[in-house]
Swiss-Prot record:
Protein origin, superkingdom: Viruses
Protein name (Swiss-Prot/TrEMBL): Poly(A) polymerase catalytic subunit
Gene Ontology MF, one: poly(A) RNA polymerase activity
Enzyme Commission number(s) from the entry: 2.7.7.19
Transmembrane domains' residue ranges: none
Reaction equations catalysed: RNA(n) + ATP = RNA(n)-3'-adenine ribonucleotide + diphosphate
Pfam families, per database record: Pox_polyA_pol, Pox_polyA_pol_C, Pox_polyA_pol_N
Native source organism of the sequence: Molluscum contagiosum virus subtype 1 (MOCV)
UniProt-annotated catalytic positions: 192, 194
The keyword ATP-binding belongs to this UniProt entry's keyword annotation: yes
Length: 470
């Protein structure tokens, strides 16, 4: 037994470790040493600056914040449970090793903001956007309220921090969704801020602690099994605060992006393709009638961006020439792509991801698989004239065996998305897709092919209960 390590553990635990505790915590000695040397006074000063800048209207006094900070760094002394102590060590280590770099820098003087995007006349597309949405409004509401509508009152404060975070960390974090469109068109309202980043877990743990130290409120971090690399933060009542997808640095570098006011946003045309895919999801389509005004502004902004930056001529272009059918037994949408020079004659859109991955493994072509992670929500493989990919939304039917126009355009958007992401062969397909958004006839949805059902357990990080399961 090492005497120095024993004394370190005794000081950290506030009591002599048992023999069992000594050997369990011994591998953590270096991390514990860093925790013991951590300057909580400097840390407290950073927390106060963060409060003044981002949470000025809520939270406790300086003495209350300091008490929470000091209390957390001796929290391990109040329990003898080995699992809880190991969780505390891990969470304290996150603060010690990353808080200053991730959150502390947000209090430094801000760099100059560069307006690096052309401001367009987005209202010119509102009439077209309205026609598109009315032709899409073909689903009856089920009355089910989705969880995404339950928003925490912490969101407004977190958003202020997030906008600065995206500016300071624009090499590792990128924005999409309504806030990114607000940066292009200030008329667009936004709720929470949607982000992709390369260190989502570390960031959200630090944010959870910042909220706790300032307000005393305990939030949860949930890892959702049916969304890859996705973590959502919820308040005590299960209301949404913020979520984030984690992506690799390679994906961050390769995804098409636009710099707006020092914030990188995912290329709006990529976002337009994902919007068209989303509208094939039956619950999203059911919401359309109530969200028409908001969606009109967003869609008009995306369409005008596509018109200007990709020279799309609306009203005079050809309509889609992709022909597709559903193999209901295999749950695959088969798309004939020979009318376009895409580099393959057929696209097979699997509705079950596990089946796709199984079939790809049989082809022995793993090296050719392209994966843009959460940006595309699918891998892509082109092999012997066939594209293999996964379509993650429901497929809507206009008759028992015919795919609805809404889902046909969504599948086409998924294919176009791939070509936008790799930067080739998308111009003609994109133009035809966008000129086909208004349906010639408004057919009701008569059937729905369910989306892929993912199984698994939620992972949890709960700093109040010292629980880490992801």
């Amino acid at each position: 037994m090492n005497g120095a390590q024993f004394e370190l553990l005794r000081e950290y635990l506030g009591r002599p470790p048992t023999l069992n505790q000594y050997f369990i915590f011994k591998p953590q000695a270096r991390a514990i040493q860093r925790i013991m040397r951590f300057d909580t006074d400097v840390f407290f000063a950073l927390i106060k600056k963060n409060k003044k800048r981002f949470f000025a209207r809520i939270g406790g006094s300086a003495s209350e914040i300091n008490a929470r900070v000091l209390s957390y760094f001796v929290k391990q002394r109040a329990t003898t449970k080995v699992g809880r102590i190991l969780s505390i060590i891990e969470l304290q280590s996150v603060l010690v090793n990353s808080y200053t770099e991730i959150m502390g820098v947000l209090t430094l003087p801000a760099p100059p903001v560069y307006n690096s995007v052309v401001r367009l006349h987005y209202c010119s597309m509102e009439r077209l956007a309205e026609e598109v949405l009315w032709s899409y409004n073909v689903a009856f509401r089920s009355g089910k309220v989705m969880g995404r509508h339950c928003v925490s009152n912490l969101v407004v404060h977190v958003n202020k921090l997030m906008s600065e975070y995206l500016r300071r960390h624009n090499r590792t974090a990128i924005c999409y969704g309504s806030y990114s469109l607000h940066l292009l068109n200030s008329r667009i309202e936004y709720g929470d801020i949607d982000i992709l980043q390369t260190n989502a877990r570390l960031f959200l743990i630090n944010l959870a602690f910042l909220i706790y130290f300032i307000t005393g409120r305990n939030v949860l971090l949930l890892k959702v099994p049916y969304l890859k690399s996705y973590i959502v933060m919820q308040d005590e009542e299960g209301r949404h605060i913020i979520d984030s997808f984690n992506i690799r640095q390679g994906t961050m570098q390769n995804v098409p992006k636009v710099l707006v006011d020092n914030i990188y946003i995912i290329d709006p045309v990529v976002q337009l393709m994902n919007t068209l895919k989303m509208l094939s999801q039956i619950d999203r389509l059911e919401d359309l009638g109530e969200r028409m005004a908001k969606m009109r502004l967003r869609l008009a902004t995306l369409l005008e961006y596509a018109r200007y930056h990709h020279c799309v001529s609306f009203g005079g272009g050809a309509r889609l020439r992709l022909h597709m059918r559903l193999d209901a037994g295999a749950r695959i949408v088969l798309v004939d792509t020979r009318c376009y020079g895409l580099g393959y004659r057929e696209c097979r859109c699997y509705l079950d991801e596990a089946r796709l991955l199984q079939d790809i493994s049989k082809l022995n072509a793993d090296a050719a698989v392209v994966d843009f992670e959460a940006v595309s929500n699918s891998v892509f493989l082109i092999h012997q004239g066939i594209m293999y990919t996964y379509f993650s939304n429901t497929v809507l039917l206009r008759s028992e065996d015919a795919i609805h126009d809404v889902s046909e355009r969504a599948v086409c958007a998924h294919i176009t998305l791939y070509h936008l992401l790799v930067g080739c062969n998308y111009q003609e397909l994109l133009a035809d897709l966008l000129n086909s958004l208004v349906s010639r006839e408004k057919c009701p949805v008569v059937g729905v092919v369910a989306r892929d059902k993912k199984v698994g357990r939620h992972g949890v990080i709960d700093i109040e209960k010292d629980v880490i399961t992801h």
